[in-house]
Amino acid sequence: MNKKFQSLRGMNDIDPSGLSTWKFIESRIFEIFASYGYQEIRFPLIESTDLFKRSVGESTDIVEKEMYSFEDRNGDSVSLRPEGTAGCVRACIQNGLLHNQTQKLFYSGPMFRRERPQKGRQRQFFQIGAEAFGFPGPDIDVEMLFMTSAIWSHLNLSEVLTLNINTIGSLDERNKYIETFTDYIKRYESDLDDDSKKRLTRNPLRILDSKNVKVQEILADAPIPVSYTHLT
């Protein structure tokens, strides 16, 4: 084959020697999912771009900079999926799987983001995910934690991984933090890069994701969310 035909940057092959390990990991995870009552669902690699704009957020780096989007022959904007949750939810709604019923579903497959390839981060990467719908209360969240712990244990990862649990607080707490954070950032508006200025009017909290050095310096003294969250 002509040497100029190579895999695209950040999109790697999996040869037979690596595939056996890959299949072992998948099978163990799928077995654990099944033991907790989760069923597999499959959905397309390509979805309407608007689906991800709505679910992930128009002002996020994923939507603005990282998605592989293009127009099809009908002029519709479509995108390779950058994550699995949006497609899973869309499939459930479209197929009537959420009407007056609970669902436990899992999926796996390639996702795509045009990031800078580096160790542990590729432009085509594989995601295994589990979603639960229609369960009231926090019990299902606890079950997810137990399921994750079981996966780590079966793959001998418990000693090398740490689980950190985050919270964005209640709606009132979050709104109060957004107001305080926005007031703080506005004091430095003239020092913000163009992306951050845009986010200031559309979704101020996205500024926290900025990799701009100057913005990072401003954020160093910004109010932090945990100060506005009251856990009981």
Predicted regions and their residues:
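TRNA-recognition modules of translation machinery and tRNA-sensing kinases, especially anticodon-binding
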Residues: 1-231
